């Protein structure tokens, strides 16, 4: 806080200060423009907190309360209780970490900031009131709108309409729960368009201690012990963030905490998709092809085919935290819903035929039925899904991709058209390959080729063909000459080096410095130092030459160690890469300085540096930030386009992402939270379930983080179990041990879990102790005073119990939160990175070679025909459900 932070709002020496206006004399008070005021009315109607909603808490994106307002209101409810309140508890503070002190300050010396009022909000540096709305509160996730209320009073008449359009777009673009970095970029944009808002005050932006969660304050004050940011105006906010752009606090969420990827509007109505069974068309045809190779005239062969049909498909394909897969191999990789009743009836018919006696159905009859199953996708194309179709039909939006909302419907319709025209061809190919021409299906309709039609001007007469040929030959010759001269120019700029047998130490030809003696190496390579730290950035910030690729690299010049780096990347073993990255970075730094094709070396070095950070974060915390994964994927696309091969099982970025999604430790931490919130028999049941899960996971290969979670969870549950079983006389040491272990658990895994059972026992002990003291007969004036103190303690404990019960009730009510408040989040993802990925994907798919507008139509080549057994089918689960497709016999 600055030195002026202790200055009070009003002059206590003036006797008429209670009658003063908070915003000055009404004749000089700022008035909001009419257009801006009407825009705010529309925004308020859409994003205000419902009148019947609980305004005393902050709800996170999980629907659970994360903070409580008006701490002093509960401590000082009346004049008498205010005088009796312990002095040591009147300052609400929390330790300020070094990372938090960069942007935040301790404001525990200003208790009025934490008090709710019906008058105003405060700004941080001078602790003065700011103009804001006090008749209502914004909905959860939209508290950042309070930042733009004081700006509305500073807008000039000329910019009023432009600022109104800016306000209309603000909630739709940022959505609910944006990041602090997104708010910073929005403020920069507002300053560029409306420079008059530069000195406008803003309400306090408060940070939750130890958690990447922010809240823009209003008349309810700050949550207890939260830290205000060290800025009180638009200019100071922008300057503060600009000076600390490398801080991890910029990834914090305004209004909530956590940044996991999930479907933002997933609700209980979508839970049935978790247990529904899907199968790709490719896997379906491969499985049926295998069934046709079995001898169906024997009992054993029919049982084998029956088992195969019962195991068709996978479950758990999609859920709230798991996105529906995208397909990249063509229409045969779309997903067919097997849990549909129509598909189930056909499968049950084949199943019943397989269970009939051998005399009723011959092998040829069964083969015909099995081949007919291959036409399920063509007969039921309406239940074939791609990612676009699934998300459009269920109105689901994946967070970080709100920019795709407008294109999901269009892409889904295109996918539907392609599938309806392609499935018949796939079925025809399957029948011809599986039956050797014995069975035939009707001729499928041709696949529609989608292209953009352009209006061509009507020519009066056809040009001469020989004239066009002559122009084409002349253009080709001129292009070849220009290309040859350009290559010669590039080669003339390159410096020649002498290659060594081992990793090279290069010197430029014609240099005045004498080369080092044979067998020795210079103290350092020319140019930059080998231990220089590579910049952390994304590919869009670099300018690479298209000629700098793996094919243009001279491996003899680069040395054997660079070849080892290339082979390590191709193998994709994360542990080998983690050990080899530090040495490889120093070698690549030298190559960037001295060898030809330095652009490619720079790209590989940047990729290895980013990958090393991601591997370290994954091994330590089983986590990797979305920005790091996005940068890795961008770099992998660039490297793959330049000839570097990756493992077919998945790139390192994919392996890290899969490891994060399937983290055993994080799943156990969430399971432990569920157990701790339960009481009585529910707690014992969930504790037993958690221990069974731990016992099952110990048999698998685990990371160090998973082992640490398993050990701490086992110790915590083992400490809580005797607390629920011992006698009340022996409860105190066990309860203290369990509470201490729970605190250690929270510190280790950055959680704030509480145990409902432990809290109930602790409060029961306090009540019993107080009741015992009340039952004693007072023998003196001191005993009478003690009895009065006990009565006050009882009253205080009753209020604490009521507050605790209110928190429990608010957690239960929070489950019914509307999906509108959680629809949009994190809208301002790095747009340039997404554009780079899209461009790279377009070039890799040959997008640059497509027909350009104005060129004559050319025949589009037909796709390669489907080949059975071209690859092994991939299954998410191996769970067998014998009665999945069985229906009861009548």
From Swiss-Prot:
GO term, biological process aspect, one: proteolysis
Site (Cleavage): 255-256
Record-level Gene Ontology MF annotations: cysteine-type endopeptidase activity; structural molecule activity
E.C. code: 3.4.22.45
Top-level EC class as recorded in UniProt: hydrolase
Keyword Transcription regulation on entry: no
Gene3D superfamilies xrefs: Helper component proteinase, Tobacco mosaic virus-like, coat protein
Database matches in InterPro entries: HC-pro, HC_PRO_CPD_dom, HC_PRO_CPD_sf, TMV-like_coat, TMV-like_coat_sf
Name of this chain's protein: Genome polyprotein 2
Species this chain originates from: Barley yellow mosaic virus (isolate China/Yancheng/1998) (BaYMV)
Organism placement in taxonomy: Viruses, Riboviria, Orthornavirae, Pisuviricota, Stelpaviricetes
